[in-house]
Structure formats: structure tokens, C-alpha cells
């Protein structure tokens, strides 16, 4: 597995914050690093496999990666990221208590993926631009300025995360996408789901297309297929059982969609043939 080292990203040993844009981010194999990062998805879509679990990400997704987490990107489509790197929550020179603003692991569950709306994303871009404008100077004022801006970024992300009440269409769409991650196997009526989150069907189609590049049904199919691929790799259930468990009513249709998405059949994945060639 690839290991990324802080010495390659932080311009000097004294630096505590760094910005690494990926415009775009292509598919990247599984890796981990000896630093922490906040991944901000600017636009496009892709699959983020985090500690073995697949997540569909798009514009407004925010991912919190710790130094012991492993992750990879695949099936990227114009996926543009900004990576905000920091050495560790307790490694700042002028900040204390940073960990209180980060996701907290409870009973083995680490809420690594948040979403913010497009208005907040613009504010995030502004703060990131300010951090970049400070440059890589290592004098006291530059280090302090970068850390202050990093704290502003954390506060903004925390206040704007899904814990906040949905007050506009962007926030409602983000909550709908989070809901789909947990209810993907259900039979979905898009009119009912849109109404559940106080969206018109037309608004749902338009905003989801803008944020992910996919129609609602295409997005749902991708989520279902990613969950199915994970089960094929990590369970002993039959292909048919996995198809039904992931919301597909017909195993033949499931196999057709699966091959179209991944260029491998479910049986190929079960036998690990894709891993052999990677």
C-alpha cells in the first residue's frame, strides 16, 4: 500500500497546514499518510472507498481522513478536490482543542463524511484561497495566520454540516443523499422522496445533476452497485441474495448493470479477478 509522507507536502518542518488541490483527481489506489487531511469536493463525482467502505461523493462532500485511515478514489468523473492537510489535531503551534471540532468516533463508528451546501462551499473556497495567499513562509505571523484560517474553516464546516437544519434546497438535497446511503435497498418513488425532503421533483433532478452529474436513478444505481461490490468482496452471500439485498429485483438485470459499471461481472469480483490485475 502506498504511504504518503508529510515531508513531501509540508514546505518546511515548522509548517502545520498545507493546501493540495487536485483539479481533477483521477482514480488513485489505496493509500494512507502520516498526516491528517480534510478533503473538500468542489465538483464532479466519484467513489471514495474509506477503510474498505464505499461512499459516493460529489460537490459539497467533505471527508475527514486521519493518519491511520486508508482510502482510495475510483470511478471519478471530473472529480475536483481540495485537500487541506494538517499534521495532527495536537500539532498546531497556536491552536488548542482542535479535536473538539472534528468528527468523533463513538462505539466504533467514525462519521467521516459530511456534506455542505453550495453557499457554504463558496465560503470554504474563500478561506482556502486566503490560506494559499499566506504562502509557505515559516515566520511566526505566517504560521499563525494559516492556523487561524484553518480554525475558521473547521468552525464553518462544523456549523454547516448535516447537524444543522435544512433551510434551503442545497441543504435538503444533501440530507436526501445522506438518507439514500442508508435506504438504498428500498423501493424508491422519486416523487415521494422529493416531497419527503421538501423538494419538487424537477428541483431534485436539476440539483442532483448539477452536483453529481447523474440523474437520480443513475445515482441510486451507483450507490446500490457499490454496496453490492463490497458485499461480493467481504461476504459469502450468493450473487442473487446480494442483488436482492441491495435493491435489485432481478439478478440478471443486476449483473448487466454491474458489468456496465465496473467492466467485471459479479462472479469476477467474487473470485478476486479484478484485484489480480490491479
Curated annotation (Swiss-Prot):
| SMART domains (UniProt xref) | HTH_ARAC
Site Interaction with sigma-70: give positions. 241, 250
What GO terms fall under cellular component here? cytoplasm
User: Which residues are in coiled coils?
Assistant: none
Occurrences of domain HTH araC/xylS-type (ranges): 174-272
Name the HAMAP family for this protein. HTH_type_RhaS
Regions recorded as binding DNA: 191-212, 239-262
Which proteins does it associate with, and in what oligomeric form?
Binds DNA as a dimer.
| Keywords of the record | Activator, Cytoplasm, DNA-binding, Repeat, Rhamnose metabolism, Transcription, Transcription regulation
Key word Oxidoreductase present: no
- By its UniProt entry, which NCBIfam families does this protein fall under? PRK13503.1
Organism encoding this protein: Klebsiella pneumoniae subsp. pneumoniae (strain ATCC 700721 / MGH 78578)
**Pfam families (UniProt xref):** AraC_binding, HTH_18
Q: Which GO BP terms apply?
A: positive regulation of DNA-templated transcription; rhamnose metabolic process
Q: SUPFAM superfamilies this protein is in?
A: Homeodomain-like, Regulatory protein AraC
The protein depicted here goes by the name: HTH-type transcriptional activator RhaS
Q: Which PANTHER family match?
A: HTH-TYPE TRANSCRIPTIONAL ACTIVATOR RHAS, HTH-TYPE TRANSCRIPTIONAL ACTIVATOR RHAS-RELATED
- What GO molecular functions are on record for this protein? DNA-binding transcription factor activity; sequence-specific DNA binding
Where is this chain's protein located in or outside the cell?
Cytoplasm
This protein's major location comes to: cytoplasm
What functional role does this protein have? Activates expression of the rhaBAD and rhaT operons.
Entries under InterPro entries matching the protein: AraC-bd, AraC_XylS_family_regulators, Homeodomain-like_sf, HTH-like, HTH_AraC, HTH_AraC-typ_CS, RhaR_RhaS-like_N, RmlC-like_jellyroll
Amino acid at each position: 500500500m502506498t504511504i504518503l509522507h508529510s515531508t513531501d507536502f509540508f514546505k518546511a518542518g515548522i509548517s502545520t497546514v498545507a493546501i493540495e488541490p487536485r483539479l481533477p483527481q483521477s482514480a488513485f489506489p489505496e493509500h494512507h499518510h502520516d498526516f491528517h487531511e480534510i478533503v473538500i469536493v468542489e465538483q464532479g463525482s466519484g467513489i471514495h472507498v474509506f477503510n474498505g467502505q464505499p461512499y459516493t461523493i460529489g460537490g459539497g462532500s467533505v471527508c475527514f481522513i486521519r493518519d491511520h485511515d486508508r482510502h482510495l478514489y475510483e470511478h471519478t468523473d471530473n472529480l475536483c478536490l481540495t485537500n487541506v492537510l494538517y499534521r495532527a489535531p495536537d500539532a498546531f503551534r497556536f491552536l488548542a482543542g482542535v479535536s473538539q471540532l472534528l468528527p468523533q468516533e463513538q462505539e466504533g463508528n467514525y462519521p467521516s463524511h459530511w456534506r455542505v451546501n453550495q453557499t457554504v462551499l463558496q465560503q470554504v473556497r474563500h478561506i482556502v484561497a486566503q490560506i494559499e495567499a499566506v504562502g509557505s513562509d515559516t515566520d511566526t505571523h505566517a504560521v499563525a495566520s494559516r492556523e487561524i484560517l484553518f480554525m475558521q474553516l473547521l468552525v464553518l464546516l462544523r456549523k454547516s454540516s448535516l447537524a444543522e437544519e435544512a433551510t434551503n434546497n442545497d441543504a435538503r438535497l444533501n440530507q436526501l443523499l445522506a438518507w439514500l446511503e442508508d435506504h438504498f435497498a428500498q423501493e424508491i418513488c422519486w416523487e415521494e422522496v422529493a416531497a419527503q425532503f421538501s423538494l419538487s421533483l424537477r428541483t431534485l433532478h436539476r440539483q442532483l445533476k448539477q452536483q453529481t452529474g447523474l440523474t437520480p436513478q443513475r445515482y441510486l444505481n451507483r450507490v446500490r452497485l457499490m454496496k453490492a461490490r463490497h458485499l461480493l468482496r467481504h461476504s459469502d452471500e450468493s450473487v442473487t441474495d446480494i442483488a436482492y439485498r441491495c435493491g435489485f429485483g432481478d439478478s440478471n438485470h443486476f449483473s448487466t448493470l454491474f458489468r456496465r459499471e465496473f467492466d467485471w461481472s459479479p462472479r469476477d469480483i467474487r473470485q478476486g479477478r479484478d484485484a489480480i490485475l490491479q
